[in-house]
Every structure is written in structure tokens, then in C-alpha cells.
Regions:
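Active-site proximal beta-strand in glycosyltransferases
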Residues: 49-51, 65-84, 111
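Carbohydrate-associated surface elements
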Residues: 116, 137
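N-terminal pre-catalytic "stem/leader" segment of glycosyltransferase-like enzymes
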Residues: 1-47
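Acidic anion/phosphate-binding donor-loop and adjacent secondary structure
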Residues: 122, 138-156
Length: 198
């Protein structure tokens, strides 16, 4: 049995995509691989693999411990993708950005959830061979196509045209989530309902 320690505070803020992805991964591991993996969360004892989901300072310090095993880091964001979402005074933003990249450089291997992050990580002198793209898991229990009747009920409940085609965007309201493009498309296509939930 492989000893894995998950380091995460991703589920401490409800509704965050990072938290949802982490919880879904944990559910999958515990459901399908409980006989292969001994998973602990936020423990500082020996581990063959330490899997970092969030960049908390205590987790960063743990990367210097000799018993961490292979350090794997999930990269959900980069300094440039936080612009407009993390509001810090300029000097603190610079310090945080350096800390973030330093955290990522402490990893033996990095998993990105967005393939566009790979060349950006290379620009920070992280080797391409040390980066793997794996998209987030999506729970089919929570995300599924609704019946037509339920769609119509929700359209009526929220005051949307029953007959107009609708495009829905979800996520935090940030440039990196594509909000400006979404708004541009909405302006160019007034015959379509554009709704952003997040």
C-alpha cells in the first residue's frame, strides 16, 4: 500500500473550484483505490508521496522536511492569472508572486489543470519534463443535463425567456475565466441569452 499525504485547505472556502476538484479527487481515490493507497490529509509524518493542492505557508515549510517523499504540486493558478482576483498592495503582491513560484519550484513534479500554464511555468524556469497536464474531474452526480421540464421551470423562476437560446458561463468573475470574451460575445449576439453564474 502506497502512503500518500494530501496537503490542502482547498475545501475551507465553499464554492471554490479548487475545493470542488480536490473533494472530487479524494472521493474517487477513497472509492476506487482504498486498497492501493493509504491516504492521509495534512499530516507531517512519513509519506511516499506528498501531494500539494494549496500553497499554504505551513505546507511550503513541510517541503523542506526529509520525510516528504516525492512532492507533487497541483497548479491551479499563476501570478498573472491572479490579476484582478487577488487584491494586494503592490509590494505584497510582488512578495506573494515570488513565494508562489518558489512553492512550485519546491515540487518534484507539477500537475496543471490548464495546458496554457505549461509554457508559462517554463518561463519561470520549471522544466517541461516536470509538468503534466491533467484536467479537473467533474462529478456527474453534481453536473448533469437537466430535463427539459426542469430547465423551463428554472427559466421561469429566474425570469429568462422560455424560447430564447441560452449560453451559461460559470466561475469566479475574473479575466482568466473568460468573462471579457463572454461579455463581448453577448454584445455581438443580442438574440441569445448570456448568463454568468459565479
Amino acid at each position: 500500500m502506497l502512503d500518500i499525504t494530501m496537503f490542502s485547505k482547498a475545501d475551507s472556502v465553499k464554492g471554490q473550484g479548487v475545493g470542488s476538484a480536490y473533494l472530487e479527487l479524494m472521493r474517487l481515490l477513497r472509492t476506487h483505490w482504498q486498497d492501493e493507497f493509504n491516504i492521509k490529509v495534512n499530516r507531517y509524518g512519513h509519506a511516499a508521496i506528498s501531494h500539494y493542492h494549496t500553497v499554504n505557508p505551513m505546507f511550503y515549510l513541510s517541503t523542506f522536511m526529509p520525510n516528504r517523499g516525492r512532492k507533487i504540486g497541483y497548479v491551479h493558478f499563476l501570478p498573472e492569472t491572479l490579476e484582478g482576483s487577488l487584491k494586494l498592495p503592490r509590494p505584497f503582491q510582488v512578495i506573494f508572486n515570488r513565494y508562489l513560484i518558489s512553492f512550485y519550484k519546491r515540487m518534484d513534479h507539477i500537475v496543471v489543470v490548464n495546458p496554457t500554464f505549461i509554457p508559462k511555468l517554463e518561463a519561470y524556469h520549471i522544466k517541461r519534463a516536470d509538468v503534466t497536464y491533467i484536467p479537473n474531474f467533474v462529478s456527474k452526480r453534481e453536473f448533469y443535463e437537466m430535463t427539459k421540464a426542469k430547465q423551463l421551470r428554472l427559466r421561469q423562476q429566474y425570469g429568462y425567456d422560455q424560447n430564447k437560446f441560452m449560453i451559461i458561463g460559470t466561475g469566479q468573475i475574473q479575466d482568466r475565466k473568460g468573462v471579457p470574451d463572454f461579455i463581448t460575445l453577448a454584445k455581438q449576439n443580442p438574440d441569445i441569452q448570456f448568463v454568468w453564474a459565479g
